[in-house]
Amino acid sequence: MCIRDSFVAGGIGRGQAIAGYLEMGAAGVQLGTRFACAQESIAHPDFKKAFFRASARDAVASVQVDPRLPVIPVRALKNKGSEEFTAKQREVAGTLDREEIAMNEAQLQIEHYWAGALRRAVIDGDVETGSLMAGQSVGMLKEEEPVAAIIEKLMSQSEEALTRR
């Protein structure tokens, strides 16, 4: 079986990583955290400031409490909101155990809670209880930069890494 047109995502913040993935056969890469704090990003200033203060170790994987309620693993900065999400999962699992709600309703409650938490952080600037989804490259971010400058820097680093190999 041959997989073509594969894109790599997660933890990419430098051009050297891009070069490495391209050499391994990736068709491209996807960066999220790096662009979340670009000058052109609509993210709330407090959301961006939380990223600038963070280290790579602050981005922790989400926890799935109950196998009946799948949670897509994502990294986010640990805060009160991530603790509340874990508590919400326990609460919903309990209502399932008591047969107070159906499975599809339980899953919807989890999805709506987390989607609402992301909006609270990114749009409203609630960095205490909102979801601060961030990859491990968050530790590299120290200030806002224009998208063009970010891309230029990444491409320059990639090209330099490829010519040195």
Name the predicted role of every residue range.
Residues M1-I3:
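Short, small-residue-biased leader/transition segments that mark boundaries at the very start
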Residues F7, G13-R165:
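Conserved active-site-proximal phosphate/metal-binding subdomains
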